[in-house]
């Protein structure tokens, strides 16, 4: 798939900081410590509707990871998938009497436009599930050969499932107990009541063709892949086992990321799938999680159509910590617009307070598990001082330009 256009990222004087992130698997904030090439996989959209602010918050969080690694001098290999074949996409297409391929292409194109408008640095590899079916099939064949996968005893639909007990490590990523897993599994695409499964929590790898559903020829028979195996196959192909960060929303902790890791580890015999499992909180509206199923959505494209500045959207979402569930409100956007106006006024002055310490604090806070509230407060403090002394010469003539470059480079906000 074609990715979106990138933007120039200014070089900022001073010393970068090693990035530390909260790892869901260990429950600790730990250094990411990548090599020369930092490797990140972030789960992408299922393209049956437009990009909402819950999506935006997730991709903006990992955009900060990307930017901080660049600031530290790393080359970044970022991979993102598109789940362009899945039940929700097929269900929406049927509801609207639309071809599922056309629907997926249109919404993927809109997603690219939204990401470009928000100045999210693009992935090097933007990969659809459909184009990855050969890799998925090869992986499932290996899992079957090793005993990690099995076919259900169903003469009509002998689907292939993953045996979750195979690795002996299942559950390490989410740290959920069986009771919690069993409660969540059916809510997030699982089929615990499928006859013939060894365990209700075993995950689908290959769905044999059903009447009226899209299917592909393969050595497994005509069918289509399960959700979790798609990300396993794409990540292994482009990044290999043991990459630095597996990212996504907190609703992907289980079953998606747990099974993606288990599939890859079962096939390779190596552990871990990723060195950090990092999850962004949910964005709510009117007291409920913003989601397509609930229909309580604020779309990025609608905000853009209403001439909302993308930098204000970034600042509004950065006002809360990325791991926290938080509310989107009109007041939040109003405050972000006010903050953006003040910042722009301050950096337009001919001089300002010395800014090196401000840039240091900005780096410190962002490197500490992406603490954007403190990072924004550090810039606010410099802006307040600059505006207090706007009528006279204060500090340095180069300070406004330094703050502008740092805010652009590290926060992706244009001043």
Curated annotation (Swiss-Prot):
Zn(2+) binds at residues 43, 231, 256. This is L-cysteine:1D-myo-inositol 2-amino-2-deoxy-alpha-D-glucopyranoside ligase. Monomer. Keywords: ATP-binding, Ligase, Metal-binding, Nucleotide-binding, Zinc. GO terms for cellular component: cytosol. It catalyses: 1D-myo-inositol 2-amino-2-deoxy-alpha-D-glucopyranoside + L-cysteine + ATP = 1D-myo-inositol 2-(L-cysteinylamino)-2-deoxy-alpha-D-glucopyranoside + AMP + diphosphate + H(+). Catalyzes the ATP-dependent condensation of GlcN-Ins and L-cysteine to form L-Cys-GlcN-Ins. GO terms for molecular function: ATP binding; cysteine-glucosaminylinositol ligase activity; cysteine-tRNA ligase activity; zinc ion binding. Its EC number is 6.3.1.13. Its cofactor is Zn(2+). Belongs to the class-I aminoacyl-tRNA synthetase family. MshC subfamily. Binds 1 zinc ion per subunit. A motif ('KMSKS' region) lies at residues 289-293. The gene is mshC. L-cysteinyl-5'-AMP binds at residues 43-46, 58, 81-83, 227, 249-251, 283. A motif ('ERGGDP' region) lies at residues 187-192. It is an enzyme of class 6 (ligase). It holds the Pfam family tRNA-synt_1e. A motif ('HIGH' region) lies at residues 45-55. It comes from Saccharomonospora viridis (strain ATCC 15386 / DSM 43017 / JCM 3036 / CCUG 5913 / NBRC 12207 / NCIMB 9602 / P101) (Thermoactinomyces viridis). GO terms for biological process: cysteinyl-tRNA aminoacylation; mycothiol biosynthetic process. CDD domains: Anticodon_Ia_Cys_like, CysRS_core.
């Amino acid at each position: 798939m074609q990715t979106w256009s990138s933007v120039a990222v200014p070089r900022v004087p001073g010393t970068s900081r090693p990035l530390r992130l909260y790892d869901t698997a260990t429950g600790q904030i730990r250094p990411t410590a990548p090599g020369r090439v930092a490797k990140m996989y972030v789960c992408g959209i299922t393209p049956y509707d437009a990009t909402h602010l819950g999506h935006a918050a997730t991709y903006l969080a990992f955009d900060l990871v990307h930017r901080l690694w660049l600031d530290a001098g790393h080359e970044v290999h970022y991979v993102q998938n598109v789940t362009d074949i899945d039940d929700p996409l097929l269900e929406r297409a049927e509801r609207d009497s639309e071809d599922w391929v056309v629907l997926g292409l249109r919404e993927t194109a809109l997603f690219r436009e939204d990401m470009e408008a928000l100045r999210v640095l693009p992935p090097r590899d933007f990969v659809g599930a459909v184009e990855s079916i050969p890799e998925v099939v090869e992986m499932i064949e290996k899992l079957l050969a090793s005993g990690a996968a099995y076919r259900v005893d169903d003469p009509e639909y002998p689907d292939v499932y993953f045996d979750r007990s195979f690795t002996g490590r299942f559950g390490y990523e989410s740290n959920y107990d069986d009771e919690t897993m069993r409660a969540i599994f059916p809510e997030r695409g699982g089929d615990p009541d499928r006859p013939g499964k060894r365990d209700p929590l075993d995950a689908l790898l290959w769905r044999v063709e059903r009447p009226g559903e899209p299917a592909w020829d393969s050595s497994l028979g005509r069918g289509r892949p399960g959700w979790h195996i798609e990300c396993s196959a794409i990540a292994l192909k482009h990044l290999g086992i043991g990459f630095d960060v597996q990212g996504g929303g907190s609703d992907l902790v289980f079953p998606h990321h747990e099974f993606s890791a288990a599939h890859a580890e079962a096939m390779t015999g190596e552990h871990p799938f990723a060195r950090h499992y990092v999850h962004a909180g949910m964005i709510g509206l009117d007291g409920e999680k913003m989601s397509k199923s609930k229909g309580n959505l604020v779309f990025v494209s609608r905000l853009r159509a209403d001439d909302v500045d993308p930098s204000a959207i970034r600042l509004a979402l950065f006002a809360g910590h990325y791991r926290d569930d938080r509310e989107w409100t009109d007041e939040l956007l109003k405050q972000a617009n006010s903050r953006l106006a003040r910042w722009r006024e301050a950096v337009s002055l001919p001089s300002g307070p010395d800014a090196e310490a401000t840039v240091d604090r900005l780096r410190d806070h962002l490197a500490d598990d992406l603490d954007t509230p403190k990072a924004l407060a550090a810039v606010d403090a410099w802006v307040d001082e600059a505006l207090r002394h706007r009528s006279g010469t204060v500090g340095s003539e180069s300070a406004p330009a330094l703050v502008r470059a740092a805010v652009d480079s590290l926060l992706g906000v244009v001043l």
